[in-house]
């Protein structure tokens, strides 16, 4: 399964669409900021399953700040990351990953791409697909109980 991971789009729908067209994913995950962007992308690509969570700039108190997904045989948590303090360290995220036996912890918020394997858990931040910085996104590959991740610059070959 090829999964496109987006975060911090901040209104830049065209960059998200470019990533979808390039990667032709089996699924899309949007990690917040902005909720409406994820909804618009889901409307544009109704045949691609999507999961999304609100970010710190989204006013969606009725929505869960994080979701636990089962992708293949993998336990994957998606969140914006601000509730786990990811701007300063991955300590809280790491404790949560260990406690919840996560195979992957996906977060955004920092606008900085990151792929890091700690113990059994893959930590992936796709960076920002929005405006201002060099746009990036993430790719997850899931096969059974194996999960791998990478980040891609939108302006480079995937």
What are these regions (language model features)?
Residues 10-14, 35-39, 57-62, 84-89, ...:
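Active-site environment of divalent metal-dependent phosphoester hydrolases
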Residues 26-27, 76, 104:
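Short, Asp-centered acidic motifs that coordinate Mg2+ and/or phosphate
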């Amino acid at each position: 399964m090829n999964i496109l991971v987006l975060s911090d789009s901040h209104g830049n729908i065209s960059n998200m669409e470019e990533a979808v067209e390039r990667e032709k994913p089996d699924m899309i995950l949007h990690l917040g900021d902005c909720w409406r962007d994820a909804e618009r992308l889901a409307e544009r690509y109704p045949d691609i399953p999507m999961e999304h969570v609100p970010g710190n700039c989204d006013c969606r108190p009725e929505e869960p700040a994080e979701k636990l997904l089962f992708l293949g045989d993998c336990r994957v948590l998606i969140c914006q990351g601000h509730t786990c303090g990811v701007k300063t360290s991955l300590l809280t995220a790491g404790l949560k990953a260990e406690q919840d036996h996560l195979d992957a912890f996906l977060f955004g918020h920092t606008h900085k791409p990151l792929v890091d394997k700690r113990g059994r858990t893959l930590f992936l931040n796709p960076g920002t697909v929005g405006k201002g910085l060099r746009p990036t996104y993430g790719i997850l590959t899931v096969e059974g109980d194996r999960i791998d991740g990478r980040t891609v610059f939108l302006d480079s070959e995937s």
